């Protein structure tokens, strides 16, 4: 079991919690918890340690837990979707499913007494929720069209799966990496368009050739938090596209685990260690942990604008297509899971993929099947060609389920996009990201227009409002947007956004 290095700094409360009992220890107690019920559980186990199993206590819905899965590269099979739906249907309207900004699924409605069965059912279909919350490595993201995209440089699917298997002991839980100083995000891009937002991950691999061999440049330290936002910086390192990626990821995680600050929780992400040491020393220590000198970075190859993958696109396999469907703010019902599985089986080869824009992609659709697929009733709700504001709308969970939230996000995001679309003609999609609080789960800094929940004063009353970010650029030459307006009341937002869309994004008022 890995331990934090002895330190003179005062440990934060989560470090004390982990010292009292390792997070992963709840794995062996889940049957006991299920039998005693949530009210009788130790609050530390219930509200924090269960997150090591991906089970989240929701203060907003006491007794109804959320389960966050791990879906490497966002790739699912129809039998997995069916298994999730079969389990969730017992909860009726209490069940709902969200596609997350890390191309993952979160399931809601779960009762504690059902968790042992739930975890067994996940494992039976090759899924896991282990280590998906708290001080663990989050879902590892990759291009959602890996293996399909004719322009891709490297198919990252098996590498990402192998990395997840290594860091989680094939989904059973790996105590080497369950006591990091903080959460840790990893992304591996194999395409040309930076589809995974490499720049906002603690560790990202982006494709690059070294002496004719394809491998990855390495980026470190990207993160968002309520007090600081930092894009990843180059480690000036290159590794071949093989097991070296796993070795280097392990080395960086070990360096972070053993040296990262465990004091002020707001200063515990990887970038703070890099700041403290400087990138040269950090690189040196990582190289020692890696056990070999690191090659210098090679020229970057990502030179495409980011795609959203919606609509019909030919695959590199002749005669087959992938079809991206827009799922408004990523929200699904149990019935939707069944329907997506059915479409994948009927028209494709049983595969469904998720994107960091909270959408789905059906893959391997033969040319001849396209017209019938496009006429399926589900596609009237999950459109392959959504209107330009809905198309680019992403939203975090918000106050419906998240107790950090300062505002309701998802329903408001849909309503505002639809009302502005009805009034305006837009020359191109505009990416609007909503996030309910400064934790930035909805990534407002990568959006054309980012909306961050805030409490604002209007007419002497505190009301729900937002701070507005502008100028986020994704894909080639990605950079983060910056706060441009503060304290806009949500009820004034349609007017403010209308003006922004006209002035900056070429929107024109529709003549009725
Ligand atoms: Fe997040 C905490 C939801 C992506 C930064 N995030 C939370 C919690 C767990 C808080 C809580 O316990 O209620 C939220 C759960 C609410 C719920 O019931 O759904 C939550 N985060 C989400 C999701 C579901 C947003 C979404 O609607 O898609 C995303 C799940 C991703 C996944 O599948 O693992 C999600 N969170 C992100 C991202 C975006 C990303 O990874 O690209 C970020 C910013 C990037 C980053 O982390 O550097 C993000 N979440 C945070 C933070 C701030 C971290 C920090 O260093 O301060 C918190 C708060 C914390 O960890 O203390 C947080
Ligand atoms: Fe919750 Fe805030 Fe994250 Fe939204 S940004 S899911 S409100 S923690």
From Swiss-Prot:
EC number assigned by the record: 1.7.7.1
Keyword Ligase in record: no
InterPro entries hit by this protein: Cbl_synth_CobG-like, NIR_SIR_4Fe-4S, NiRdtase/SiRdtase_haem-b_fer, Nit/Sulf_reduc_fer-like_dom_sf, NO2/SO3_Rdtase_4Fe4S_dom, NO2/SO3_Rdtase_4Fe4S_sf, NO2/SO3_Rdtase_FeS/sirohaem_BS
Recorded superkingdom: Bacteria
UniProt: [4Fe-4S] cluster binding residues: 396, 402, 437, 441
Signal peptide: none
Cystine residue pairs: none
Binding site for siroheme: 441
UniProt keyword annotations, A-Z: 4Fe-4S, Electron transport, Heme, Iron, Iron-sulfur, Metal-binding, Nitrate assimilation, Oxidoreductase, Transport
GO molecular function: 4 iron, 4 sulfur cluster binding; ferredoxin-nitrite reductase activity; heme binding; metal ion binding
Broad class of enzyme this protein falls into: oxidoreductase
Gene Ontology biological-process entries: nitrate assimilation
Keyword Iron-sulfur assigned: yes
Catalytic activity: 6 oxidized [2Fe-2S]-[ferredoxin] + NH4(+) + 2 H2O = nitrite + 6 reduced [2Fe-2S]-[ferredoxin] + 8 H(+)
Spans traversing the lipid bilayer: none
Similarity section: Belongs to the nitrite and sulfite reductase 4Fe-4S domain family.
Name the record gives this protein: Ferredoxin--nitrite reductase
Primary gene name: nirA
């Amino acid at each position: 079991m890995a331990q934090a290095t002895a330190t003179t700094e005062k440990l934060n409360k989560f470090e004390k919690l982990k010292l009292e009992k390792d997070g992963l220890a709840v794995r062996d107690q889940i049957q006991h918890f299920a039998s005693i019920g949530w009210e009788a559980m130790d609050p530390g186990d219930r509200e924090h340690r269960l997150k090591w199993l991906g089970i989240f206590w929701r203060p907003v819905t006491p007794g109804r837990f959320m389960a966050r899965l791990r879906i490497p590269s966002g790739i699912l099979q129809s039998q997995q979707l069916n298994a999730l739906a079969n389990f969730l249907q017992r909860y009726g309207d209490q069940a709902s499913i969200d596609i997350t900004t890390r191309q993952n699924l979160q399931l809601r409605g779960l009762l504690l007494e059902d968790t042992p069965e739930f975890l067994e059912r996940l494992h039976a279909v090759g899924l896991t929720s282990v280590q998906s919350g708290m001080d663990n490595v989050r879902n590892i993201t990759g291009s959602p069209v890996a293996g399909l995209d004719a322009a891709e440089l490297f198919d990252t699917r098996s590498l990402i799966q192998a990395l997840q298997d290594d860091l989680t002991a094939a989904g059973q839980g790996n105590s080497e990496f369950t006591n990091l100083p903080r959460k840790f995000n990893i992304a591996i891009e194999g395409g040309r368009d930076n589809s995974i937002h490499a720049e906002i991950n603690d560790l990202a691999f982006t494709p690059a050739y070294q002496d004719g061999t394809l491998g990855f440049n390495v980026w470190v330290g990207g993160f968002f938090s309520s007090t600081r936002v930092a894009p990843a910086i180059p480690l000036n390192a290159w590794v071949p596209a093989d097991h070296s990626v796993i070795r280097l990821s392990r080395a960086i995680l070990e360096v972070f685990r053993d040296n990262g600050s465990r004091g002020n929780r707001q200063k515990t992400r990887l970038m703070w260690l890099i700041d403290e040491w400087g990138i040269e020393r950090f690189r040196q220590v990582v190289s020692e942990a890696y056990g070999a000198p690191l090659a210098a970075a090679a020229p970057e190859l990502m030179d495409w604008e980011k795609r959203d993958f919606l609509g019909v696109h030919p695959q590199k396999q002749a005669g087959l297509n992938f079809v991206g469907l827009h799922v408004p703010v990523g929200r699904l019902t149990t019935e939707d899971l069944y329907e997506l599985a059915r479409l994948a089986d009927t028209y494709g080869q049983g595969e469904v993929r998720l994107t960091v824009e909270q959408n789905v992609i059906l893959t391997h659709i033969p040319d001849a099947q396209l017209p019938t697929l496009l006429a399926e009733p589900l596609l009237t709700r999950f459109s392959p060609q959504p209107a330009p504001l809905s198309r680019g709308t992403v939203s975090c969970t918000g106050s419906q389920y998240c107790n950090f939230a300062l505002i309701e996000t998802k329903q408001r995001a849909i309503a505002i996009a639809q009302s502005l679309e009805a009034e305006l003609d837009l020359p191109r999609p505009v990416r609007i990201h909503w996030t309910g609080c400064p934790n930035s789960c909805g990534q407002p800094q990568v959006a054309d227009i980012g909306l961050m929940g805030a409490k604002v004063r209007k007419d002497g009353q505190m009301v729900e409002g937002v701070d507005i970010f502008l100028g986020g650029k994704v894909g080639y030459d990605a950079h983060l947007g910056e706060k441009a307006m503060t304290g806009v009341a949500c009820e004034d937002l349609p007017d403010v956004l209308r003006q922004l869309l006209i002035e900056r994004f070429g929107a024109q008022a529709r003549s009725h």
